[in-house]
Amino acid sequence: SFIDATLESGKVFVFYETLFSHFKDELLDTPVANVSMLCTWLQYKYEKEFYFDKEYMTRDRYIDIDIDHEVISYMREQWQVKSEDEVVKALDYLPEDSVRTAFNRNTNVLIAATRGMRFHIDKFEVSEEELNDIIFIIETTIEKFQFIGADELFDYIHQNLPQLINNNSDISELGIRKALAVLLADK
């Protein structure tokens, strides 16, 4: 069954919403018309095998499910730019809306590369020396002109730190800018 396959894959929980979505077509001709009814039926059928939480069932009573952590960990493991839909499909054992929310709200870890595409900040390759060079140019330009535009900064990076662009060749210019903004936010 889908429940057994999910649990055997190393997951210790199964969300009712995910089960309902997975079996929606099979449930059309049954009294199970919504997630709530499915939950009630599962509690009856698996009463002695599982613990039942509000949103999921598990064999471990003390489990704490953190969907943000699941999404962030997946993105880090993938080590590439991924679309929101790709992540939803890969994490089909989690509720779709929750995955989409986690994908879009963790903007300091999952960096926007283009519309609907993100990567994990750890994928961005930049050395401390490169960051210090960027900080220096920002500070000196602001000191001299009271402002530095993103285009000016990116031109400087292209001319003086081409290895930063080369090391992150699969990340768009927007993604590089956003990653730098996150890394330099506290400096």
Residue ranges and their predicted role:
Residues 1-187:
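C-terminal non-catalytic scaffold/interaction domains in large multidomain proteins
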